[in-house]
């Protein structure tokens, strides 16, 4: 089996839109190969942040040598269609032999930080609270850094003060760059990191280049913080070759992602991709409609809709399909088990299509 490297270049990424049916793949892999992707965060590249990642991150106190050259190249050379999403996605990648009706099994083998910093943004009233940002601001971007503390990767951010966009404008006007947040400063807060990719998806069966923002049965912007190293993601295939893509790297995210983004930061990702016949998948997991996660301890079903109540309902129905079709329950007993033993959590409440996921203990159901 091979390791195929997929860098972030203007010819290997899409900015703001998903691949569509008929798009030419930027790479091809065989089932069982590992895709090594230099994923790139969109934060620091966006127009409201100056579309100048070199200057933007210098203004936060980041050394020039620690600012990614591919970020600068994408900002300068790639097209970002007006009205599209913010995300940079690598792909599409052809998975040889994958055809509609099959499922991809994507093992998340490794997620390594490419940088030691990231950004959390609240923009355009699109978080959970439409009243935020305050004081007429369209966007607030908060800088955070990654440090090693007591053997663990930790995020550090300030509690108060100017945001990263203010720091950038001060720097452009000739002011000094901001100082990096330090763990011994009482005006900072520390929190644990758990790197994951917010976007892993397959190409939907449409000729339209959809926005990267809403997720779907094809995966995409799922923003489920369980998509960490050691998790397997299953996705249904809709077009020949699957058209796999990935992006939206995070250092950390709370369930709900309430401010709109979480700690967005670039990662190198190793994804091993396999193909499963639809009939084999159905025998094991039932007639699911959309993404399924498998962690060491849980099977995680997913649901999406414009409103959280409907997303929860969708997720419950997917969970019932798993238990009834794949695990021998009848519908009444499956519903009772879910009520007693499964946790339904908000994946995200900010991506147009709201997301809910359910964690079902594998030990309970013999999986």
Q: What residues fall within each predicted segment?
A:
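Glycine-rich anion/phosphate-binding loop at the beta-strand->alpha-helix junction
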Residues: 103-285, 293-295, 317, 324, ...
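Long, hydrophobic/aromatic-enriched structural stretches that serve as scaffold segments
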Residues: 66-115
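Basic/polar N-terminal segments that are highly enriched at the extreme N-terminus
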Residues: 1-9, 367
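Short, well-ordered loop/turn sites that connect or cap secondary structure elements
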Residues: 29, 95-98, 227
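Short alpha-helix capping/helix-loop boundary micro-motifs
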Residues: 18-24, 87-93, 217-222, 321
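Extended amphipathic ligand-handling, pore-lining, and cofactor/metal-binding catalytic surfaces
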Residues: 287-306, 316-320
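Extended C-terminal subregions enriched in glycine
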Residues: 310-314, 321, 325
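N-terminal, Lys/Arg-enriched amphipathic/low-complexity engagement segments
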Residues: 7-82
């Amino acid at each position: 089996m091979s390791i195929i490297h997929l860098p972030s270049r203007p010819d290997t990424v899409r900015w703001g839109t998903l691949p569509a049916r008929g798009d030419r793949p930027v790479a091809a892999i065989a089932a069982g190969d590992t895709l090594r992707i230099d994923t790139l965060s969109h934060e620091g590249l966006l127009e409201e942040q100056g579309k100048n990642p070199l200057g933007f991150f210098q203004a936060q106190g980041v050394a020039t040598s620690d600012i990614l050259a591919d970020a600068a190249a994408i900002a300068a050379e790639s097209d970002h269609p007006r009205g599209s999403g913010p995300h940079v996605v690598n792909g599409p990648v052809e998975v040889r032999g994958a055809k509609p009706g099959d499922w991809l099994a994507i093992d998340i083998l490794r997620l390594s930080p490419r940088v030691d910093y990231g950004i959390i943004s609240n923009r355009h009233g699109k978080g959970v609270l439409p009243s935020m940002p305050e004081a007429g601001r369209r966007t607030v971007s908060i800088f955070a850094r990654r440090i090693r503390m007591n053997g663990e990767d930790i995020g550090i951010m300030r509690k108060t003060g100017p945001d990263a966009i203010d720091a950038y404008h001060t720097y452009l006007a000739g002011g000094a760059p901001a100082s990096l947040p330090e763990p011994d400063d009482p005006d900072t807060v520390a929190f644990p990191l758990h790197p994951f990719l917010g976007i892993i998806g397959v190409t939907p069966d449409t000729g339209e280049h959809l926005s990267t923002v809403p997720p779907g049965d094809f995966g995409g912007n799922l923003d489920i913080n369980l998509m960490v190293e050691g998790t397997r993601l299953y996705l249904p295939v809709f077009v020949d070759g699957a058209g796999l893509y990935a992006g939206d790297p995070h250092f950390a995210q709370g369930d709900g992602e309430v401010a709109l983004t979480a700690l967005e930061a670039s990662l190198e990702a190793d994804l091993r991709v396999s193909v499963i016949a639809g009939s084999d998948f159905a025998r094991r997991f039932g007639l699911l409609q959309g993404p399924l996660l498998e962690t060491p301890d849980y099977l995680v079903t997913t649901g999406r809709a414009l409103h959280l109540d409907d997303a929860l309902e969708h997720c419950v129905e997917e969970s019932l399909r798993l238990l009834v079709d794949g695990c021998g329950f009848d519908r009444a007993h499956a519903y009772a088990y879910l009520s007693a033993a499964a946790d339904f959590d908000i994946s995200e409440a900010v991506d147009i299509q709201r997301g809910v996921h359910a964690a079902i203990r594998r030990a309970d159901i013999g999986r």
